[in-house]
A protein has these predicted regions:
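Electrostatically charged, flexible surface regions
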Residues: 3-4, 153-263
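Residues at the starts of beta-strands that form the adenosine-phosphate
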Residues: 10, 60-64, 87
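Short, glycine-rich nucleotide/cofactor-binding loops
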Residues: 14-16, 33-45
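A short, N-terminal amphipathic alpha-helix
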Residues: 43-60
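A glycine-rich helix N-cap at a beta->alpha junction
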Residues: 74-111, 187
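Glycine-rich phosphate-binding loop signature in dinucleotide/nucleotide-binding domains
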Residues: 112-122
Length: 263
């Protein structure tokens, strides 16, 4: 782990390594979760992009990517390094698949405290609103509770004004603006614009990077059991109606809807 300079503002992005469901759909196989191809959780990638945009405006921001996983399970962290992270840390747990949201939050809080002992206090802690596998949206607020920090969720945009973090967040009426004193925790949804892509050079550097591992002292007892994963059923495929007249098209549409039990 790099030693940030004394002027750096430390920002930690918590991210999860999740099954690559697109590959699972193509293979159409049932596999135990540890054998599935993996990728960086999409909303965590948006949290990383929000962090990178803050660094674009303030070069003193130092981004550390943090993930829980088995020893050597660092693919998501290498993706983060290739995209925007300055360094990365893997907090080692024997079996992350059996941890519920509260256990994950407690372990992340433990890891963050260990990082702070070496690199100094973290002013900002970002994460995705939820993961594509768990979808509980509980880790962000529970992590803030474990660290006794203010929290804002469903973030769409982040900006800094002195010692205050401003989060534009989505809500039922559109968007709202939340201000929090630093340090704080924020969870991000799909933010406007697409996340930046890694370059060939950054990907090569990330593939060679040495990612330090943290040994956590307090591992909660397993609470979940994942027996298998399977691709979702694809359902009925789209149909193109190419009749000469509108009347013939309407007749075919009626027949298709009737056969599908819609009518």
């Amino acid at each position: 782990m790099m030693e940030p300079s004394g002027t750096d503002r430390n920002l930690i992005v918590c991210m999860k390594q999740v099954p690559d469901l697109s590959i699972g759909r193509r293979e159409k196989t049932e596999q135990p979760p540890q054998r599935l191809p993996v990728r960086l959780n999409l909303l965590d990638a948006y949290a990383l992009e929000a962090a990178a945009r803050l660094r674009d405006a303030d070069k003193n921001i130092h981004i550390t990517a943090l993930s829980l996983g088995r020893s050597g399970e660092d693919e998501a962290l290498r993706q983060a390094l290739a995209i925007a992270a300055d360094d990365a840390v893997l907090a080692v747990v024997p079996d992350p698949d059996v941890l519920d949201a509260l256990a994950v939050s407690r372990l992340l809080a433990q890891a963050i405290r260990l990082i702070e002992k070496k690199a100094g206090p973290a002013e900002l802690i970002f994460c995705g609103q939820q993961s594509i596998d768990g979808q509980s949206a509980q880790v962000g607020p529970q992590l803030a509770q474990c660290l006794n920090l203010p929290f804002a969720g469903r973030g769409l945009e982040a900006s800094l004004c002195g010692g205050v973090m401003r989060i534009r967040q989505g809500n039922e009426d559109g968007t709202g603006l939340v201000e929090m004193d630093l340090p704080c925790v924020a969870a991000f949804d799909k933010i406007p614009g697409e996340p930046r892509l890694p370059t060939v050079r950054s990907s090569m550097e990330a593939s060679r990077a040495v990612i330090p591992m943290l040994e956590l002292s307090e591992i909660p007892a397993p609470l979940l059991t994942v027996r298998e994963t399977r691709p979702a059923s694809r359902g009925m495929q789209g149909v193109r109606i190419c009749k000469q007249t509108g009347e013939d098209s309407a007749k075919q549409l009626f027949q298709l809807l009737n056969a599908a039990g819609v009518l």
